[in-house]
Amino acid sequence: MGQKINPLGFRLGATQSHLSLWFAQPKSYSMGLQEDEKIRECIKNYVQKNPRLSSGFEGIARIEIKKRIDLIQVIIYIGFPNLFIEGRTQGIKELQMSVQKRLNSVNQRLNIAIARISKPYGQPNILAEYIALQLKNRVSFRKAMKKAIELTEQADTKGIQIQIAGRIDGKEIARVEWIREGRVPLQTIRAKIDHCFHKVQTIYGVLGIKIWIFVDEE
């Protein structure tokens, strides 16, 4: 059997960079890691709870965290302009206060910035959320996967692979279905591949969605 490795971890330092940039003493490293998890969780919860921000799905491509002694810099990469645009500064201030409250950190200031991505459907997280929304609305999984592939073609990607696992279409036995378009060279380290895993709760149970996108070769 082939051993599967996470394509992002496999390429760290080569074509993939870290989403968290900070240093810590070995004793306090785990606390820093938990702090990062709290920040990401808080941002996602805030977007989900505000219907004016999320039209069915979050639209967040990734969240980068950079820490200094006195500052935590958070950059949220979004795919769609409706997220945080209406009453922009007000929305960011609310979010900043919400995250600061959750962290309960006195020594470090928190700064949240928003960055827009030009081709949102080239991002696996946004694409996975789109497929999840289709599956929740009981659209056929094959139709949802084909539509997702059509959307990635607009983003000039070189290849995409989509995998859905679980009780697909409410069948009694769980199975795995996948589709690939173009090249997805998982064993080539210099190939820049974006990957994500997303869970979706349907009326039949939980489905797992995995997406691999071949962006470019360095």
UniProtKB/Swiss-Prot annotation:
A matching Pfam family: Ribosomal_S3_C
Domain KH type-2: 43-118
Annotated keywords: Chloroplast, Plastid, Ribonucleoprotein, Ribosomal protein, RNA-binding, rRNA-binding
Principal location class: plastid
The organism's place on the tree of life at top rank: Eukaryota
Subcellular location, record wording: Plastid, Chloroplast
Gene Ontology biological-process entries: translation
Listed NCBIfam families: rpsC_bact
Family: Belongs to the universal ribosomal protein uS3 family.
Protein name in UniProt: Small ribosomal subunit protein uS3c
Native source organism of the sequence: Acorus calamus
